[in-house]
A protein has these predicted regions:
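Aromatic "clamp/platform" in nucleotide-sugar-dependent glycosyltransferases that forms part
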Residues: 250
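Conserved catalytic-core segment of nucleotide-activated headgroup transferases in glycan assembly
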Residues: 149-222
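Short hydrophobic beta-strand element within catalytic cores of glycosyltransferases
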Residues: 267-271
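A short alpha->beta transition loop at the rim of the catalytic pocket in nucleotide-sugar-dependent
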Residues: 243, 265-266
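Short alpha-helical segment that forms part of, or immediately flanks, the ligand-binding pocket
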Residues: 236, 255-263, 278-279
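Short acidic/histidine- and often glycine-rich active-site loop of Leloir-type glycosyltransferases
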Residues: 272-284, 288-289
Length: 352
């Protein structure tokens, strides 16, 4: 009788444990499927990830340093909701030390360690320039920028008459043209030296967006048009009138303008030391690199004499974009986020 009672107890406990296991399995399997309904649409410095059906994934990107206590509270709120986090280098040298002397230092005062807030990181750096805190983190890293995910279709571009040789964007910082945040990241000091070469030696016509209150070489008088800040659509229209894009920037993580120019089939002339976007500059195909006002000369010669041989748009269509880079990103997320709410995602994109 005692043995029978003991068997009943054992069977009862076993059934109870099995029920708990089954309940937990069902919970974890179904939790991810319905999670997309709960994912908030976030704002800077956070960004959303979306699947190919434009449904938000349950991974929130941290794209820049926090600016205020409210950002800290939002991080805690999203974390408590069960959302996962991934870092992305979309802002200056983030998550490394930000060199721009005009940058907000709230994150340093609060001693934020963003590499400990996330499970993986999408970065933009050359291998030798990866910040030490990213190297030391041991987390999975992927070379991927937001601009790599730009949607570009196979539709040929309609022919457009080129009115200018180049375009360069450096927005105003203040009314006196004193050094500021914009002039630092757009490398205005180097740009002025290069503009003198471009105008005096090559007689190139160009558009300079943003520096309406700044003086630079008179060699460009009459051949370089200076405009104030342009709304996005107007800027795109002006850019399409130019043959190539000039980018002397260094402290720039993911210049969307580089990808936009490439997709307009414009070669790009880019500072070799730029933080991000360098991986889309392929010599003789999408553009050329330079570092100063001296070594820009042979690169200008190359672009201006071989302009029609560059095929930047075709290269981007074959190597980047939502369906190619987006698939790489989706595979990276599936590999490193086991609780991803869409385990069948084909490609992922980021809010830009």
């Amino acid at each position: 009788m005692k043995q029978l009672t003991r068997k009943k107890i054992i069977i009862g406990i076993s059934l109870f444990l099995i029920a708990i296991v089954v309940t937990l399995v069902i919970y974890f399997l179904t939790r991810g499927e319905s999670y997309d309904e709960e994912v908030p649409i976030v704002k800077f410095p956070f960004k959303n990830l979306f699947d190919e059906n434009k449904k938000p994934l349950n991974i929130i990107l941290i794209s820049a340093p926090f600016r205020e206590i409210e950002h800290e509270k939002l991080y805690s709120k999203y974390k408590n909701q069960g959302l996962a986090f991934c870092g992305i280098s979309s802002y200056l040298e983030f998550p490394g030390h930000i060199d721009n002397p005009h940058e907000d230092r709230f994150h340093e005062e609060r001693k934020h360690d963003y590499t400990k807030m996330v499970s993986a990181w999408l970065h933009c750096f050359r291998q030798e320039k990866i910040p030490q805190n990213l190297k030391d983190s041991g987390m999975p890293l992927l070379l991927m920028t937001e601009a790599d995910l730009k949607w570009v279709d196979d539709t040929p571009l309609p022919p457009m008459q080129k009115e200018y040789d180049f375009i360069y964007c450096c927005l105003e910082d203040n009314s006196k043209c004193d050094p500021g945040w914009q002039s630092y990241i757009r490398n205005w000091d180097l740009a002025k030296k290069c503009l003198e070469v471009m105008c005096s030696q090559f007689h190139l016509k160009g558009i300079l967006v943003g520096r309406t209150n700044c003086e630079f070489t008179d060699k460009c008088n009459g051949i370089v048009k200076v405009t104030p800040f342009l709304p996005y659509n107007e800027f795109q229209t002006e850019m399409k009138k130019c043959k190539f894009l000039f980018v002397p920037n260094i402290s720039d993580a993911s210049p969307r303008v580089i990808t936009e120019a490439i997709c307009y089939n414009m070669p790009v002339l880019v500072n070799y030391n730029i933080v991000g976007g360098w991986h889309n500059v392929i010599s003789g195909v999408t553009g050329e690199f330079f570092t100063n006002e001296t070594d820009i000369i042979p690169q200008l010669t190359k672009i201006t004499t071989n302009y029609n041989s560059y095929q930047p748009r075709s290269w981007f269509q074959a190597n980047r974009g939502a369906k190619i880079s987006g698939k790489i990103l989706a595979d990276f997320l599936k590999q490193n986020y086991p609780d991803l709410n869409n385990k069948e995602v084909q490609y992922a994109t980021v809010t830009i």
